Swiss-Prot record:
The active site is at D204 (proton donor). It comes from Streptococcus pneumoniae serotype 2 (strain D39 / NCTC 7466). It comes from the Bacteria. This is Purine nucleoside phosphorylase DeoD-type. Transmembrane segments: none annotated.
Length: 236
């Protein structure tokens, strides 16, 4: 057991999907995994291990924001030996060419958080995805016919930002979307020498306000990113 995860050693696979919403973790376990067993209910942050196409895979919620995903991802890596971590979550488009329900693969994650600067105040330490996972995910998504964008995202510490226009301006510099977790996940992956990737479904748009989705749709659909994430985890 770790501080926030009740699993015993061996109950978590070495590859895992990390949705922010614990109910999305439950949905993935019930709809994609065979013989799924719940290994964690602490703080209702549900985690499950099962099989996908004969491969042992886990899925666990992380909550919202970089502090929350940092707690769970670190414990999964350090205490349970997880080697491949793929975030599957939602993001808001910052780019006119990126639309609701399309996928974004975060090649890198800029951030307005001090989570990295606290350790490296003298550097702009880049938060980048595992190229191996990124390359596999891109080709899998293309083979499945999914509209997929690859590029930089913004991992923000703030959901209700007072710098709305500044965030939108980033879209003109090629930033695809804004979310709240990828930079922290990539930083931990660099620190502990594991592979990480963030796959997001666009749930709304900061540049096209008429594009949005319902809370129920965000919880129970958006299955494209789940399929890509699972296929990427088991790809040789």
């Amino acid at each position: 057991m770790s501080i926030h995860i009740a699993a015993q050693q061996g109950e978590i696979a070495d590859k895992i999907l990390l949705p922010g919403d614990p109910l999305r973790a439950k949905f993935i376990a019930e709809n994609f995994l065979g013989d799924a067993v719940c290994f964690n209910e602490v703080r209702n942050m549900f985690g499950y291990t099962g099989t996908y196409k004969g491969h042992r895979v886990s899925v666990m919620g992380t909550g919202m924001g970089m502090p929350s995903i940092s707690i769970y991802a670190r414990e999964l890596i350090v205490d349970y030996g997880v080697k491949k971590l793929i975030r599957v979550g939602t993001a808001g488009s910052l780019n006119e060419e990126v639309h609701v329900r399309e996928l974004v693969l975060a090649q890198a994650a800029a951030t307005n958080s001090n989570i990295v600067r606290n350790d490296w105040p003298q550097y702009d330490f880049p938060q980048i995805a595992s190229f191996d996972l990124l390359d596999k995910a891109y080709h899998i998504a293309k083979e499945l016919g999914m509209t997929t964008h690859v590029g930089n995202v913004l991992s923000s510490d703030v959901f209700y930002s007072n710098y709305f226009e500044k965030n939108i301006e980033l879209g003109k510099w090629g930033v695809k979307a804004v979310e709240m977790e990828a930079a922290a996940l990539y930083y931990l992956a660099a620190q502990y020498h594991v592979d990480a990737l963030a796959i997001m479904t666009i749930s709304d748009s900061l540049v096209n306000p008429d594009e949005d989705t319902t809370a129920e749709e965000r919880q129970n659909t958006f299955t494209d990113m789940m399929k890509v994430g699972l296929e990427t985890l088991i790809a040789e």
